[in-house]
Swiss-Prot record:
Name of the coding gene: pfk
Pathway(s) served: Carbohydrate degradation; glycolysis; D-glyceraldehyde 3-phosphate and glycerone phosphate from D-glucose: step 3/4
Keywords on record: Allosteric enzyme, ATP-binding, Glycolysis, Glycosome, Kinase, Magnesium, Metal-binding, Nucleotide-binding, Peroxisome, Transferase
Family stated for the protein in its record: Belongs to the phosphofructokinase type A (PFKA) family. PPi-dependent PFK group II subfamily. Atypical ATP-dependent clade 'X' sub-subfamily.
Name of the protein: ATP-dependent 6-phosphofructokinase
Length: 490
């Protein structure tokens, strides 16, 4: 049997790291947040919510949390000296709310929660800070270009209140970059003081470029990122918005594949899920559903030979199997070596690994008369998952994320984004956040859970099958004895 390696090869040049592992060469300076000079205005929240000030919910203190509280080596406690600044409402502001224009843009693929973030930013800016104006630029960074700047719309509380129940993005989106100088010209033309960039790593790299051009011109504009990655692969982030919704919707697809599989003799259900470089959705949905028997992710290379042996192992114990595969898995297989080019964001187009696996399984089963009634069903729910509204949990998460982003941006924080880290909302410089990619640790807790609910081909398959039959026989005997005992009392 071929032994799978611990890590797959990806096309990305971005360094990758396991969630709870150290990132090499981290330095405290990499977590230092830029702030526009001067805080000369008192927040209206001080007057509105005096009890919050007394309770120190609103303050000007710079509070940090430990970057890594996990113990390492022989020590029983963490030795990490790195910290991340906590996000909170501030007493002193850099921007005068009455003269502040807030703008936002959504970029890249759609994701559950985008409209909740648009809504949260608008309501916090309008209702809490009473800013001069909130502007939405349409269709991603194109809306900031010369060609698209005329499509900008003003956002009000009445316009955004109903967005909670809608999928997609109210502002529209697009991929690909635009001329940085033109985009900054648009910000100047509209008198924008704060720009929120809602998108993935490509979007946030664009935000860094905008911030640098703003600095070069000496403009008083804050550029603040709100990370969007349904794959949950953002570094220095425990969870990204849309991820929990995606896992919940993925479980529905897995249940459908399971229903198909158990309805046929030697039925096979295949579900392809999002996960270009990181398999968090596939792994979490596998654990949550407890109906998947094989989980394939980019972080864990598995050969075709090993895959087929795992299928045979399952078929020795049952007559159905569900395979969950992340879209980035198997791209180094010979079947996936066709060059499909890149999309507008520069991402390599992937071969549909779900279709590849379907054909491999069909060919394998067709060679064995035992499987003459087998069937293989393939489900790709990706776009349905991306386009649905956020779950209740994700919607609340988006509200917290966007509200705190407004608080910190009003205080002059710039070139940073907001993330959740060990149940706390923290600020991370954009450059640091996009310098690494988070991946599933195949030696960590999540992958351990996956291994516990899926087929394990590492042992003696015949012995495992015998033990399973023995357990079932004991259960049947116990049930029979119970019935006999009840009959004897009649």
């Amino acid at each position: 049997m071929d032994e799978p390696s611990n890590m797959s090869t990806t096309s990305s040049k971005i360094p990758q790291y396991d969630f709870y592992s150290d990132v090499d060469n981290l330095h405290p300076d990499q977590f230092r947040i830029q702030c526009l000079p001067g805080r000369n205005f008192i927040s209206p929240l001080v007057e509105q919510k005096k009890d919050f000030v007394k309770a120190h919910v609103i303050h000007d203190k710079d509070l940090d949390i430990m970057y890594d509280p996990m113990p390492k080596g022989k020590c029983n406690i963490s030795q990490s000296c790195l910290t991340l600044p906590l996000a909170c409402p501030r007493v002193s502001l850099h921007f005068d709310p009455s003269k502040t224009t807030v703008a936002m843009v959504t970029c890249g693929g759609v994701c559950p929660g985008l409209n909740d973030v648009i809504r949260g930013i608008t309501l916090a800016a309008v209702c809490s800070y009473h800013v001069k104006k909130v502007i939405g630029f349409k269709y991603g960074y194109w809306g900031l270009s010369k060609a698209g700047r005329h499509t900008a719309i003003e956002l009000t509380s009445n316009i955004v209140r109903g967005l909670r129940h809608l999928g997609g993005t109210f502002l529209g989106t697009s991929r690909g970059g635009q001329n940085i100088s033109d985009m900054v010209d648009t910000l100047v033309e509209y008198g924008v003081n704060i720009l929120f960039t809602i998108g993935g790593d490509g979007t946030q790299k664009g935000a860094v470029a905008i911030s640098e051009e703003v600095n070069r011109r000496g403009l008083d504009i804050a550029v603040f990122g709100i990370p969007k990655t349904i794959d949950n692969d953002l570094s220095f982030s425990q969870r990204t918005f849309g991820y929990e919704t995606a896992v919940s919707e993925a479980v529905i697809a897995i249940r459908a594949a399971h229903a198909e599989a158990i309805s046929h003799e030697y039925g096979v259900g295949i579900v392809k899920l999002m996960g270009r470089n990181s398999g968090f959705i596939a792994a979490s949905a596998t654990v949550a559903s407890a109906l998947s028997h094989i989980c394939l992710i980019p972080e864990k290379n598995v050969s075709k030979k090993v895959l087929l042996s795992l299928i045979e192992a399952r078929f020795m114990m049952a007559k159905d199997i569900v395979i969950v595969v992340a879209e980035g898995f198997g791209q180094d297989w010979p079947d996936c070596n066709e060059d499909l080019g890149s999309d507008a964001s520069g991402n390599k187009r992937l071969t549909d690994i779900g279709l590849v696996i379907k054909k491999i399984v069909q060919d394998h089963l067709s060679k064995n008369p035992k499987y003459h009634q087998s069937t293989v069903k393939y489900i790709d729910p990706s776009y349905m998952i991306r386009a649905c509204p956020a779950s209740t949990s994700d919607a609340a998460f988006c509200s917290n994320l966007s509200t705190l982003a407004v608080h910190e941006a009003m205080a002059g924080r710039t070139a940073c984004l907001i993330t959740l880290w060990y149940s706390n909302f923290v600020l991370v410089p954009i450059k640091t956040a996009v310098s690494h990619r988070k991946i599933v640790s195949t030696g960590g807790a999540l992958w351990r859970q996956v291994r516990e609910v899926t087929v394990d081909g590492s042992g003696d398959i015949a012995m495992v099958h015998q033990q399973e039959l023995s357990r079932e026989l004991k259960a049947i005997n116990a049930h029979r004895n119970s019935i006999m005992e009840q009959l004897s009392k009649l």
